[in-house]
Amino acid sequence: MSSFDYRSRLKELSARYNPEASILVNERMQSEDHYLDTDVVRYVKRSMRAVDDDYTKRTKDAGEAVKQHLNNELINVTYEYQGSVMTNTHIKGASDIDLLVICEKFEDTEINRVRDCLKTPYGYSNIQLSRLRNYELSFSLYRGDSREDLSNLRRQIESIMISKYTICDISKAKSVRITNQHLHRDVDIVTSSWFQSLEYVLDGMPKEEKGIKIYNKNLGFAEGPDFPFLSISRINQKSSESNGRLKRMIRFLKNVRTDSQKDIQLTSFDINAICYSIPVADYAYLDYKQLVYLLWSTMYHLWYDNKLDKLKSVVGDEYVFKGKPNKIEALKALEDDVFKIHQDLN
């Protein structure tokens, strides 16, 4: 007897992946696994798949529409996206998307750390020392008011979005949320600024390593830094090395979490870290059944072998479970569900 009602789970997954009940999308989903003879196999394989391209395109189009409205009126800003849509690990056909509106008037830096390194230049290569020197020589202190710049930018974004969208929520501290009623998508518009870390300078200032700080209007200043582009780059790169298997594992865990009867409080950030921590060599050639077993084994040994305190984010700048007992219990709950699915597959 199966541990779960997979037929019911398949209906929930189908509604999530194909919320508009598109006949074409449904036919594509069905055609890929019509030969599979059990519901558990169908559930696992569908849970690992990406959302249909048509749905994902509409999500991105909603973001581009917002960008165009802002671009018509704002100056001294650039635009970037962050989140699971950018790694194609989202599990909702009607996913929302985060649009970063980045103030170009100033950039936060770690200039003091750069100068400290130059005072004691040990352990760095000649190339790195050259980068540090050039960075210090080109550095100039911003004479404006960065907090006021971000506050003004947030107010401008609110004003533009209110004028363009009937459904617009400006109450959130870190973002403005609009609903594109034509495309049936939400877009979160995030006021932010650039952050240049010491590591960014040492590595030659690659774009993906550039950080951001997010403006909190309730506090009146920017929080962070975060490194969304590095996380996106690392997940995309590592998944390409295994023909997409990393992303399949991420989607699978997110779907199992979402379909669970338990309230599993793990975020995409947490699940990304769990899957990313697995060496590519361990799964580069595994099939879907073996991937399920690997995920169960990984989560089980994380807590059983007391390794949770060591697990860091994809970027490596934050501990995921350390000092967070509720998350540890959530991991155990997810691990238990995955183990039952593994048993049902075999």
Swiss-Prot record:
One of its GO terms (molecular function) is diguanylate cyclase activity. One of its GO terms (biological process) is defense response to virus. The keyword Nucleotide-binding applies. SUPFAM superfamilies: Nucleotidyltransferase. It catalyses: 2 GTP = 3',3'-c-di-GMP + 2 diphosphate. Its EC number is 2.7.7.65. It is an enzyme of class 2 (transferase). Keywords: Antiviral defense, GTP-binding, Nucleotide-binding, Nucleotidyltransferase, Transferase. The keyword Membrane does not apply. It comes from the Bacteria. Belongs to the CD-NTase family. Bacteria with this enzyme do not have other c-di-GMP synthase enzymes (no GGDEF or EAL-domain containing proteins), suggesting this second messenger has been co-opted for CBASS signaling via STING activation. Cyclic nucleotide synthase (second messenger synthase) of a CBASS antivirus system. CBASS (cyclic oligonucleotide-based antiphage signaling system) provides immunity against bacteriophage. The CD-NTase protein synthesizes cyclic nucleotides in response to infection; these serve as specific second messenger signals. The signals activate a diverse range of effectors, leading to bacterial cell death and thus abortive phage infection. A type I-D(GG) CBASS system. Cyclic dinucleotide synthase that catalyzes the synthesis of c-di-GMP, has no activity with other NTP substrates. This is c-di-GMP synthase. The lineage of its organism: Bacteria, Bacillati, Bacillota, Clostridia, Lachnospirales. The gene is cdnE.
